[in-house]
Amino acid sequence: NKVLLETVVLALGTNTVDNYESLLNQFIAKLPKGHRLILVTPYDGRTAHDGTSIAVKTRQYELELAKKYDYVFVADWYQTAIQHPEIWYGTDYVHFGSETTTITKGGELYAQTVKQAIDEAVKKGTVKK
């Protein structure tokens, strides 16, 4: 029906996307006026502390975009993931949870991270002009 909600959430980068800058720039350019964008930072625990990894570089670029555009916000899943090592035990360090408790906890943390960014964006009220 060609309806796009005012707040758009985009998660990009856990699977290696070498042209992340180009893709993010295109998405921002094509985002219609009257909308805001929430970028969910990627997390890959295998390379989380490697500044040369694509996931880390993607996160850095997303943080830069949020500073550049007042209608772009960040749901920093990377930061949340780093702060909660308990959800990664027994996993591939990309997909949280190795049993019901940690799967549930990881899902709740992810949802809370995105919701906090949405709440902040809506409170600020800025959209693309």
Name every feature range the model reports, one short phrase each.
Residues 1-25, 30, 42-47:
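Oxyanion-hole/transition-state-stabilizing segment in secreted/luminal serine hydrolases
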Residues 40-42, 77:
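Generic beta-sheet signal
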Residues 47-129:
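Catalytic His-Asp segment of secreted/periplasmic serine-dependent ester chemistry enzymes
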Residues 32-36:
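A short helix->loop->beta-strand "cap" motif at the edges of active sites that frequently abuts
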Residues 38-40, 111:
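Short amphipathic alpha-helical segments, especially helix-boundary/capping motifs
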